[in-house]
Amino acid sequence: MKIVKISPRGYCYGVVDAMVIARNAALDTSLPRPIYILGMIVHNKHVTDAFEEDGIITLDGPSRLDILDKIDSGTVIFTAHGVSPEVKQRAKEKGLTTIDATCPDVTKTHDLIEAKKAEGYHVIYIGKKNHPEPEGAVGIAPDIVHLIERADDLKTLEIPTDKILVTNQTTMSQWDVQHLMEDIQKKFPTAEFHKEICLATQVRQEAVAKQADVADLTIVVGDPKSNNSNRLAQVSQEIAGTKAYRVADVSEIKLEWLQGVENVAVTAGASTPTPITKEVIAFLEQYDPMNPATWERVRKVPLQKILPRVKVKKEQ
């Protein structure tokens, strides 16, 4: 069986930066304890499990404000997905120490929304409902930001001005965003468009679109909560025309997927640890459908190998 290792794949700079920020926090003895992450620092359970070994507690809930209600003291890390001004204010009121690990691409979208609100615009924001990134973006200006996920959401959308900006969640499928923007243009012809698919998401989607078409099957390594990982599987099926499955790690691969398959493409979401992806590739490279000794699918990557290394600061 031939393995097509789609490139680029895996970690983006925003994810690595967020994890380094959190690791440095774990090593900083001057920070008030306990240290919490407000939601998953990135959408990957292997990463959050590894941070728990570092002594950092991940709390999750229906919204960032709901999670904050569970915290009365210590340090709070805001995730790469960004948070609303209300969340920052609530943390300040509670006397919590805060560390912001928001991805710079997300911050850029927040700044854009603030600027357009000051100019009297309303904003149509294309994103996934119940995902933390849209929650933070809508929270920048909830009175003028309208979240839509699909074309049906446009049917009941009414905006009391011709000054409309359209932007989006950074990890959406660029093809889905383009189609929705075309629909929005028809209903709101005066709308201005500012596509905010981050470069890492864009190039990974384009790589799948161009490289997965030679494969019989695509395996996307990524957490079920990872929107960008789920979108890679979608791109493989809808753009490259190749059946795709998303797996959290090697243990989720089903042997029946591989029956009659000669070429398997492998990619990974932007929040997927590299050792987890390498383990999937290693399994596929040694797999022999005629040899049961090659069928074992057990994740063996230790949590200590999941997080990026950071330098321990020496005391002066």
From Swiss-Prot:
| Pfam families to which the protein is assigned, alphabetical | LYTB
Positions that bind isopentenyl diphosphate: 43, 81, 131, 226, 228, 271
Q: What is its EC number?
A: 1.17.7.4
User: Which residues are named in the active-site annotation?
Assistant: 133 (proton donor)
* Protein function: Catalyzes the conversion of 1-hydroxy-2-methyl-2-(E)-butenyl 4-diphosphate (HMBPP) into a mixture of isopentenyl diphosphate (IPP) and dimethylallyl diphosphate (DMAPP). Acts in the terminal step of the DOXP/MEP pathway for isoprenoid precursor biosynthesis.
* Binding-site residues, dimethylallyl diphosphate: 43, 81, 131, 226, 228, 271
**Which gene produces this protein?**
ispH
- What name does UniProt use for this protein? 4-hydroxy-3-methylbut-2-enyl diphosphate reductase
Q: In which pathway does it act?
A: Isoprenoid biosynthesis; dimethylallyl diphosphate biosynthesis; dimethylallyl diphosphate from (2E)-4-hydroxy-3-methylbutenyl diphosphate: step 1/1; Isoprenoid biosynthesis; isopentenyl diphosphate biosynthesis via DXP pathway; isopentenyl diphosphate from 1-deoxy-D-xylulose 5-phosphate: step 6/6
Recorded family membership: Belongs to the IspH family.
Please give the CDD domains that the UniProt record associates with this protein: lytB_ispH
Q: Which reaction(s) does the protein catalyse, per the Swiss-Prot or TrEMBL entry?
A: isopentenyl diphosphate + 2 oxidized [2Fe-2S]-[ferredoxin] + H2O = (2E)-4-hydroxy-3-methylbut-2-enyl diphosphate + 2 reduced [2Fe-2S]-[ferredoxin] + 2 H(+); dimethylallyl diphosphate + 2 oxidized [2Fe-2S]-[ferredoxin] + H2O = (2E)-4-hydroxy-3-methylbut-2-enyl diphosphate + 2 reduced [2Fe-2S]-[ferredoxin] + 2 H(+)
What residues bind [4Fe-4S] cluster, as annotated? Answer: 12, 103, 198
Q: Which residues bind (2E)-4-hydroxy-3-methylbut-2-enyl diphosphate?
A: 43, 81, 131, 170, 226, 228, 271
Q: Which GO terms describe its molecular function?
A: 4 iron, 4 sulfur cluster binding; 4-hydroxy-3-methylbut-2-enyl diphosphate reductase activity; metal ion binding
- Record's cofactor remark: Binds 1 [4Fe-4S] cluster per subunit.
UniProt xrefs under InterPro entries: LytB/IspH
Q: Which PANTHER family match?
A: 4-HYDROXY-3-METHYLBUT-2-ENYL DIPHOSPHATE REDUCTASE
Which key words tag this protein in UniProt?
4Fe-4S, Iron, Iron-sulfur, Isoprene biosynthesis, Metal-binding, Oxidoreductase
Q: Which cofactor does it need?
A: [4Fe-4S] cluster
